[in-house]
Amino acid sequence: KFSEQNVLKENFTKNRNILLLIGHLRTIKYLLKYHKKFLVKTNSDLIISTWTDDETDDKTFELIKEKLNPVYFEIEEFNFNSTVDIFGNLNKFDLMFGKASLSTRSQIYKFSKSLHLIEKIEYLQNKKYEIIFKSRPDLLFFSNINLHISDKSIFFENTIGDWNRDRSDRFFYGKRDIYFSFIKIL
């Protein structure tokens, strides 16, 4: 659920694009300067939607807020039942398949939730973002980002994983409407 207490209105800007950092924070504190460069280079605001973990302390949360100026920053406790709305009751057998299955499930939940977060932040700022970038907080960007893109294309990072076998869900981006369409069919 969207929470007003996670909105950081003091960080609202006129930026045209938005970066979603979704997933566990892990090593983000070592990547803050790179994320900041990305935000500046792409004229992007930032939404962070992460999970609680045993590794991240309050100092790291404050450092992220100070260095990256997110417009929305939420930290959720993972709740398997919150994913039932997306997957349905018949898919509860995922609990039997261990961490990988739960990780995928939580990732799809965050993808779906991100649409709602973007819409709420857009509403609060009375604007619509042009390009939406999605990544994990613990990843470094290697791609040269092209901001002059087609309305009908989604671009996937090609430096992570075996590009011949699969497409990375770790970093991708596209214009707002195609991004929303893509996430809705996941």
Describe every region a protein language model picked out.
Residues 1-186:
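ER/Golgi luminal nucleotide-sugar-dependent glycosyltransferases, focusing on the catalytic module
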